[in-house]
Amino acid sequence: MAEGKAGGAAGLFAKQMQKKFSRAQEKVLQKLGKTVETKDERFEQSASNFYQQQAEGHRLYKDLKNFLSAVKVMRESSKRVSETLQEIYNSDWDGHEDLKAIVGNNDLLWEDYEEKLADQALRTMENYVSQFSEVKERIAKRGRKLVDYDSARHHLEAVQNAKKKDEAKMAKAEEDFSKAQVVFEDLNQELLEELPVLYNSRIGCYVTVFQNISNLRDVFYREMSKLNHSLYEVMSKLEKQHSNKVFVVKGLSSSSRRSLVISPPVQTCTAFSPVSPVTSPTSPNALSVTSESESVSATAEELTSEAVGEDSCESEESLKDEEADEDQSETSSSEEEEDEDEDEDEEESLAACNGPTPTPAPTPAPASPAAEVKSQEEAAPCSPTSSLGRGQTGKEHSPPGEVVLRARASSEGAEQSKRTASVQRTSAPPSRPPPPKASGGGLSSPPGSAEASKACHPRASSDASSDPEPPETGEKEGTGSSGPKEPHASSTKSATQVVSNDENTEL
């Protein structure tokens, strides 16, 4: 009995070794191109899809296992944190009993989430992946049967093409070929039908797994949100109970620590809409965050106003230049008219005081500066009131050339100076003939004529008293001052010459 079993096992082993040898020989011949390999493009495409599906399934299964492991770790961590909070929470603080219920519900919620996630997601994915090994074995078996089929076919062709034909060998070769063909075709047909179905089943598996995950997370986070609201209310009560004990986080204003801003939990009604974190009104950092946002908005407004102001400055400056040119032209024309009126008044007053105009005589030598100063000192006490009024009006009446324009850019300084000089030249009064002068050899006037001329010519006396400096100083001031001051200086000089001529006549 034992010998029969040993002989049967030896025969089976020899048969398997013979198959392996024939398969290896066939593969070598196929690689060398001695024989033709049977190919099925439809099966090859299905097999390629299967291997890709298998790789993706194993990857997703591995990630889900890591996800479940992380949930377990998070559950343990949350449990330890809750237990520690319950231990350090004093019994005389508000919400002590509520905190116990929150800690217990938190642990139960994590446990339920972990169990359902493992059952509805991980086990579903595990069942999906487990079928890959069976299909993979069948594909490998199909490959071996394909080699047997090719080997039997090639052996039959060799027997049929032999010069010496043996009917027994030919019959046995045909029988072997028929068996190999039936086995291969049956297995190949089964795989051609199963592989596409298995490949399409991946969609249903993904839908089922992630629907379960999303539902579990939705329920878990909704219930956890309620617990978080309850915990936040307990901490708010504790804060109100000890409102004088404030904890300030140092370095919170730093840009790298903005995540430390304390925020209340998100409202449950807006769980499916994008929610921005709201700063707690009781937080000591709410004012700092508000001030930072206000400063940012103010900076943005300043940048916007500067950008708009730069655009409008150019147009305003051009308008100001045109207005300034028009004002200067109007001012110069009005000043010319005033100067002409003053000249006419002076000529009339001189004609009235001096009487009939004498015949022109040779011009005498100019008086010395000392004589002019003396004449000015003698003419000064004649009319102090008129000289005082003249000085006040001279101060009040600003020369037309002193139009002050607002300074603009530094690049426009040269253009403004040239423009001011041109305005001064255009605003200068027109040249007029000098007033008549009395000569030493002319008609002699009575002694009282000088006093009468002084009395009748208050303008000259006021000019003389208001400007007691010598002519050289006046000329220096005239050259240093702007152009519109020249008419006043010329009128003062002419009046001084008239007074000096009258004194010479009297002498």
Swiss-Prot record:
Q: Which regions are flagged for Pro residues bias?
A: 357-367
User: What are the residue boundaries of the BAR domain, all occurrences included?
Assistant: 28-244
Mark out the compositionally biased spans (Acidic residues).
Answer: 308-349
Q: Where is the composition biased (Polar residues)?
A: 489-507
Phosphoserine occurs at which residues? 273, 375, 411, 439, 445, 449, 461
Membrane topology, record value: Peripheral membrane protein
Cellular-component GO terms for this entry: anchoring junction; cell cortex; cell projection; phagocytic cup; plasma membrane; podosome
Q: What is known of its domains?
A: The BAR domain mediates dimerization and interaction with membranes enriched in phosphatidylinositides.
Put simply, this protein is called: Bridging integrator 2
Which species is the source of this protein?
A: Rattus norvegicus
